[in-house]
Amino acid sequence: MNINATLFGELLAFIFFVWFCMKFVWPPIMGAIEERQKKIADGLAASERGEKDLELAQAKATEQLKEAKTQAAGIIEQAKKRGSQIVDEETQRAHQERENIIAQGHAEIEAERNRAKEDLRKQVAALAVAGAERILERQIDAAAQSDIVEKLVAEL
């Protein structure tokens, strides 16, 4: 291998080419690569943040759903209790009304019975006086008849 001027010329041209590439070509390429690396890293970080936010949102939604179910169950339980209370109150009121109607009916029956007894006493007294008149074959004066009727009514 001969070292001649061509080899030195090629060596100088290569060194100039390497210097030119290092000075003018390499920095924009490295800047583009670094920028691309940064965009990829930012995208991955955003993706991880998004996944964490999604997990937090899902956990929050699950918790809110549980709370809503608990509240709904509480409202349903309160509604059932209130419904039972209303039914009990109405049942009690109906029983009380029934008792009042029955008591009123008994009072009316008792009053009617007393009126009927009084009418029967008067009729019995009148029949007794009529029978006594026939037996005695004479007319009793009004005062004596009234006395007899009152005594009979009192005895009955």
Swiss-Prot record:
Cited InterPro entries: ATP_synth_B-like_membr_sf (IPR028987), ATP_synth_b/b'su_bac/chlpt (IPR002146), ATP_synth_F0_bsu_bac (IPR005864), ATP_synthase_B_chain (IPR050059)
Subcellular locations according to the entry: Cell inner membrane
Disulfide bonds: none
Transmembrane segments: 11-31
Assigned keywords, A-Z: ATP synthesis, Cell inner membrane, Cell membrane, CF(0), Hydrogen ion transport, Ion transport, Membrane, Transmembrane, Transmembrane helix, Transport
Gene Ontology cellular-component annotations: plasma membrane; proton-transporting ATP synthase complex
Record's bilayer topology term: Single-pass membrane protein
Subunit structure: F-type ATPases have 2 components, F(1) - the catalytic core - and F(0) - the membrane proton channel. F(1) has five subunits: alpha(3), beta(3), gamma(1), delta(1), epsilon(1). F(0) has three main subunits: a(1), b(2) and c(10-14). The alpha and beta chains form an alternating ring which encloses part of the gamma chain. F(1) is attached to F(0) by a central stalk formed by the gamma and epsilon chains, while a peripheral stalk is formed by the delta and b chains.
Role played: F(1)F(0) ATP synthase produces ATP from ADP in the presence of a proton or sodium gradient. F-type ATPases consist of two structural domains, F(1) containing the extramembraneous catalytic core and F(0) containing the membrane proton channel, linked together by a central stalk and a peripheral stalk. During catalysis, ATP synthesis in the catalytic domain of F(1) is coupled via a rotary mechanism of the central stalk subunits to proton translocation.
HAMAP family hit by this protein: ATP_synth_b_bprime
NCBIfam families (UniProt xref): ATP_synt_b, PRK05759.1-2, PRK05759.1-4
Entry similarity comment: Belongs to the ATPase B chain family.
Name of the featured protein: ATP synthase subunit b 2
Species annotation: Pseudoalteromonas atlantica (strain T6c / ATCC BAA-1087)
Gene symbol of the encoding locus: atpF2
